[in-house]
Amino acid sequence: MSHKNISNVVIAGGTGRLGPSTIKHLLKNGLKVSVLTRDPVSANLPPDVDIIGADYTSAETLTPSLVGRGFDAIVIILNRLAYDASVVTMQAAVNAGIYRAIPSFFGVSLDNPEIANMPFMKTKLPVLNDVLAKAEKGEITYTGINTGMFLDWVLDEDIFVGLSGKAPTRVADGGDIPMSATALDDIGKAISSVLSKPEETVNKLYYIHTVVMTQNQVLGYAREAAPGAEFAVEQVDTKVLVEAAWKRYNEGIRDRVSVRDFVIRASYGMGNGFFPKTDNEFMGIRQWSDEELKEEIFKRVKANPPVNLKVPEG
């Protein structure tokens, strides 16, 4: 199975968080772009993007949306919890004879056995194994892109550091653990870059990041940007967190708190959130300096002052 040129791409999940940047860079590179969506009527997409209705119930219901349209590649950027839909989409892509898939490999790496055994990963493993098995049989080719954290999302939603001041930042294992994060725009750029080099990127996994940052570093910038804000912290030991998470899980408590604590342990406590080596250069991604990260934090804090900011009198 070989393909020297990819020009016609379909996106599953193109109306979600990664959609705008992915569509932007694919169009910029001159590719024909279509988007699968469950709700074509309400999809708000650029005029030069084809919108295709999709039923993700099964591969059989989804395949007709892909067949006969000449797609060379499919980019799967469905909701990070839509694991069943990801497997369905991959099978439908095989049924339609699509050459290349970029599956949803954007989160943490599964290389560490302890992490792979965590409950939140057990739903991701079937997706990964399914892709690898299909590639092994020559049914499809793939390219994986591991991005670490989505930079915009973890800053917007107070996930990495509580920039809004609404709740304390949960500082993991001292707060000096380096973490890789990639801006949504750079993820779109990387996806487009991969598809422009189909032969070089066949059945490979790449690592990229826009910035490497620590919680203490970002907290420091935030405090500098808003000296009157509290930016409270809660120190957490990820080993203690994961022990409690396993206890809850084994007692049948499968709540968001448990999932969150497993993720925190995997990302911070086990160093799995930092990529010591990346493929930035190959993908055309430029890593930010500390000064650029500081400017980004200042911009965000100034635009949305923390709720507990004390306004100077006078």
Where are these regions (language model features)?
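Oxidoreductase cofactor-interface core, primarily capturing Rossmann-like NAD(P)-dependent enzymes
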Residues: 2-47, 57-60, 96, 109-230, ...
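Conserved Rossmann-fold cofactor-binding substructure of NAD(P)-dependent oxidoreductases
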Residues: 50-72
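Short, amphipathic alpha-helical "lid/cap" segments that border enzyme active or binding sites
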Residues: 63, 184-192, 290-298
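NAD(P)-cofactor binding segment of oxidoreductase domains
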Residues: 68-103, 115, 119, 123-130
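Short, glycine-/small-residue-enriched flexible loop/hinge segments at domain edges that mediate gating
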Residues: 102-110
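A generic structural motif
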Residues: 105, 231-242
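A hydrophobic C-terminal alpha-helical subdomain
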Residues: 239-314
